[in-house]
């Protein structure tokens, strides 16, 4: 038993590791597109291949050679953090204070969908956002 464990460890340690040998490229979107988004709090990739990044200054949609910055129609300005989820044609953004927005593909803008405080009657902090396979939006507080 001891010898087989030793052989396994020697084989494992001497085997080349592919993850270490791969080259990865990191690109800074601020430098690539000349924009300023310093504090991104959420990022998702949608089914169309766009990368969406959310910050207090709005939501950024990035393609391979283009970008677009969307302003969110905040009801209050005390936004510290955003959460984001995407599945199918549904893209949802929620602020920590319960303002929930969805992307309207026809009008190409974000619209306020609802506010948690008006539905629940309290000011719970949004901690996560998920869209399940049935298209239902789950918000944890």
Question: What does each model-identified segment do?
Answer:
Residues 1-141:
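Carboxylate-rich, polar loop motifs that coordinate divalent cations or form catalytic acidic clusters
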């Amino acid at each position: 038993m001891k010898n087989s464990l030793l052989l396994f460890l020697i084989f494992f340690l001497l085997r080349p590791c592919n993850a270490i040998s791969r080259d990865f490229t990191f690109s800074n979107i601020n430098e690539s597109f000349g924009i300023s988004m310093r504090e991104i709090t959420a990022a998702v990739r949608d089914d169309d291949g766009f990368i969406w990044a959310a910050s207090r200054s709005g939501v950024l949609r990035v393609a391979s050679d283009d970008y677009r910055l969307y302003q969110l129609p905040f009801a209050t300005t005390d936004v510290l953090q955003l959460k984001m989820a995407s599945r199918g044609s549904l893209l949802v953004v929620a602020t920590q204070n319960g303002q929930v927005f969805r992307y309207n593909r026809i009008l190409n803008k974000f619209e306020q969908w609802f506010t948690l405080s008006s539905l629940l009657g309290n000011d719970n902090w949004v901690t996560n956002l998920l869209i399940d396979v049935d298209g239902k939006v789950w918000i944890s507080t």
